[in-house]
Amino acid sequence: DTLRSRGLGDVYKRQVDAQRLAYADRDHFFADPDWVDVPVEALLDKTYLQQRASARFAPDAVPKHGDPLGSTALGADTTQEPSGTTHLSLIDSEGNAVSFTATVESAFGSARWVGGFLLNNEMTDFARSYEAEMPMPANVIAGGKRPRSSMSPTMVFDESGELVLVTGSPGGNSIPAYVAKTILGIFDWQLTPQQAADHPNIIARGSKVRVEIGVDGGAEVAANLK
């Protein structure tokens, strides 16, 4: 029984478009909320989300961020985060749960060993790939400012408040796409948690789409995304 046999012919295309739009907004708006006014409520507004969902763009285009507040004064940021992260999800016999993501940023972090552990190099999570012009990106480096992170430890609850899923992932910039795929796999594709986590990924940010080996009908999927 494959995903293709489930009648999901255009699921991957929709998944790719949704990721590209979400990353465009994330890259533009998200940074340390103590330094930047992140418009979380506006970005989650149903009318705004419907507007973004109806957006159309060429496969090789870089989708522009939305503008839920009517005006923005932030620069573009396309910084790629290294992938030196670990995640675990646990639920014990008494129902206690934890979704835990830890990272030292790059593999072995800063390569500095102190007191039995490695120091991280999280400063590489600040905006580094941007044009030297004003306005500056939301995630630009500053003293005392926390860098943006893609870590996404996640718990899903039903309408009654009961815990139904604990998930998360390593993977640098790709973490949001990995977590979304797992949630989609469990609740929309009716996969088991293990099947959903194991399912090959499609990651889309900007104009680039990465289709992992093992995606059902991968060649067809890649052709459909051109």
Predicted regions and their residues:
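Hydrophobic, well-ordered secondary-structure elements that form the walls
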Residues: 22, 95, 155, 179, ...
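Extracytoplasmic/secreted envelope proteins and their assembly/folding machinery
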Residues: 16-19, 176, 180-183, 194-197, ...
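Positively charged, low-complexity/disordered segments
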Residues: 1-8
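Hydrophobic alpha-helical scaffolding
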Residues: 9-10, 38, 42-43, 77, ...
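Structural signal for hydrophobic packing residues in well-ordered secondary-structure cores
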Residues: 6, 19-30, 52, 56, ...
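Extended C-terminal subregions enriched in glycine
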Residues: 94, 144-146, 188-226
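Active-site rim segments in enzyme catalytic domains, especially the processed small/beta chain
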Residues: 96-165, 176, 189, 193
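Internal maturation/activation junctions in enzymes
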Residues: 9-103, 112-114, 130
